[in-house]
């Protein structure tokens, strides 16, 4: 140290202190910036994970309902086969047996693809699955129960594809 020039020493100490304070300020600024970058990285990771989950959910929904249009277009075929079987009565005619077999096979294939038949005769009316077309007084039937089904309804993977058209017992 230079004892002969105390002013120079104090100036040098002041300069060192100022430099140290500047370095400390820079370190604090860099730490704050690092904390911000870490927070940004965590947020981006969370966003990426959420996006991945959303895409997986969308793909699952697309796969689950990919055959909705085809099965929806088959509903009139089911209706025609069902009506033909009802019109044929209980005769054990080979044509009737063939129609029954075809109908059961079609229902099985559709069922294997998520289609569920709604035939609510005798069940309580459910506005989420049934469409009431009329109410009739029906002795012996519980009020609000389905007494006649004009057109069966269908669910596709637990989602309503077509409501059942029904007549409900009046109160």
From Swiss-Prot:
Keywords: Chaperone, Cytoplasm, Stress response. Belongs to the GrpE family. This is Protein GrpE. Participates actively in the response to hyperosmotic and heat shock by preventing the aggregation of stress-denatured proteins, in association with DnaK and GrpE. It is the nucleotide exchange factor for DnaK and may function as a thermosensor. Unfolded proteins bind initially to DnaJ; upon interaction with the DnaJ-bound protein, DnaK hydrolyzes its bound ATP, resulting in the formation of a stable complex. GrpE releases ADP from DnaK; ATP binding to DnaK triggers the release of the substrate protein, thus completing the reaction cycle. GO terms for molecular function: adenyl-nucleotide exchange factor activity; protein homodimerization activity; protein-folding chaperone binding; unfolded protein binding. GO terms for cellular component: cytosol. It is found in: Cytoplasm. It comes from Stenotrophomonas maltophilia (strain R551-3). InterPro entries: GrpE, GrpE_coiled_coil, GrpE_head. Residues 1-22 are annotated as: Disordered. The gene is grpE. It holds the Pfam family GrpE. Homodimer. The lineage of its organism: Bacteria, Pseudomonadati, Pseudomonadota, Gammaproteobacteria, Lysobacterales. GO terms for biological process: protein folding.
């Amino acid at each position: 140290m230079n004892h002969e020039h105390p002013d120079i020493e104090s100036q040098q100490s002041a300069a060192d202190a100022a430099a140290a304070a500047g370095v400390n300020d820079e370190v604090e600024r860099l730490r704050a910036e690092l904390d911000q970058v870490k927070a940004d990285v965590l947020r981006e990771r969370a966003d990426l994970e959420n996006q991945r989950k959303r895409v997986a959910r969308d793909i699952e929904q697309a796969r689950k309902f990919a055959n909705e249009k085809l099965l929806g277009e088959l509903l009139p075929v089911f209706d025609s086969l069902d009506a033909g079987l009802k019109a044929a009565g209980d005769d054990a005619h080979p044509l009737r047996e063939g129609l029954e077999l075809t109908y059961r096979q079609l229902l099985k294939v559709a069922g294997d693809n998520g289609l569920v038949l709604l035939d609510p005769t005798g069940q309580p009316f459910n506005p989420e699955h049934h469409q009431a077309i009329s109410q009739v007084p029906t002795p012996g039937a519980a009020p609000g129960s389905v007494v006649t089904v004009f057109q069966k309804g269908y669910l596709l993977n637990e989602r309503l594809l077509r409501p059942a058209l029904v007549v409900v017992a009046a109160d």
